[in-house]
Amino acid sequence: MEVKILKVGKNELSLEIKGEDYTLLNLLQKTLLEDKMVEAAGSKIPHRLLETAIFSLRVKGGRNPFDALYEALDRIKAETLEFREAFEKALKEYQAGG
């Protein structure tokens, strides 16, 4: 995966992301939109054969778009860690016959 910053404004940010499809980007979008200070977040893939996506983020009232992105990534990381721990527990129970 490669990420390139295309545009940075006071309340907005656009990224070009190579080697990624909607799977990760939809999760990122959903997580960002849970933040009440995020006005809009979304992605588009201009051509499906190029494997390049454009991700855009717009925040409200002086919120730093980089901070919003970092916080969303931290929440995603925490959720995946929580899932991993729950899965490992379930696997141990299954292997123990329960």
Residue ranges and their predicted role:
Residues 1-98:
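Protein-protein interaction/assembly regions in multi-subunit complexes
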